[in-house]
Amino acid sequence: MEVHSTRAMAARAVALCEALLWEEPTPGSIAGVLRAHGELGPLELSPDDVSAMRAAAGRLMELFAAPSAGEAAGLLNRLLAGTACPPRLTDHGGTTTWHLHVDRDDDAPWAEWFLASSAMSMAVLLADHQRVPAGLCASAPCGRPFLDTSGGSPRRYCSPRCATRERVAAHRAATRGM
């Protein structure tokens, strides 16, 4: 997958939300997630950067919980109005291929970049698929975010493991009731 594609940026947003909100994030662990999603060059993150990114991830979780495309669109419009700048092309001084950014500049704070680029990628996916592009796992003990760009029915679970756990629990409950 191209690192700067819309889907890749949305997948990175989901992975960062998971790392920031379901784990004990450190600058090193978040840099690892960024590198796993193709970010190159120096990734100088401070504990304050991670804290601000964690707050941004909390705002994205509202989007993932949106019950409808209309509500998600409203949330995305508010996020974009509050964080995005006019689109600009950058190659980060020749270190990457040309791609769009909607943050202030190449030296914008990490949280600004994370929230603006995540909102933009999710907005494009919502427009392309006409539905909320991500969700929260319906398995009660989980609740993790997931990206849903499939063409079929909307996903309910973050993984086959959670889906199977829920099906087995429902089967056992139904069997006990017989």
Question: Over which residues does each language-model region extend?
Answer:
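Contiguous alpha-helical segments
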Residues: 169-178
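Short, non-ligating residues that shape and space the ligands of small metal-coordination modules
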Residues: 148, 164, 168
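Short helix-coil boundary/hinge micro-motifs
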Residues: 1-148
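A structural preference for long, well-packed, hydrophobic secondary-structure segments
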Residues: 133-135, 154, 166
